[in-house]
Amino acid sequence: GVAFDDGSYTGIREINFEYNRETAIGGXQV
């Protein structure tokens, strides 16, 4: 199961999304 409560899990998801998006832009990938 998920080891985080909804708040922490959502926060981590948001951080990962931002990181992946910035990485994609930095790598010139759309």
From Swiss-Prot:
Stretches assigned to the Jacalin-type lectin domain: 1-30
A GO molecular function assigned to this protein is: carbohydrate binding
What superkingdom heads the lineage? Eukaryota
Query: Does Ligase count among this protein's keywords?
Result: no
InterPro entries tied to this protein: Jacalin-like_lectin_dom
Q: Which UniProt keywords apply?
A: IgA-binding protein, Lectin
Subunit: Tetramer of four alpha chains associated with two or four beta chains.
Q: What does this protein do?
A: N-acetyl-galactosamine and D-galactose specific lectin. Binds the Tn-antigen structure GalNAc-alpha-1-O-Ser, the T-antigen structure Gal-beta1-3-GalNAc and IgA.
Q: Which family does it belong to?
A: Belongs to the jacalin lectin family.
| Protein name as annotated | Agglutinin alpha-1 chain
Q: Which organism is it from?
A: Morus nigra (Black mulberry)
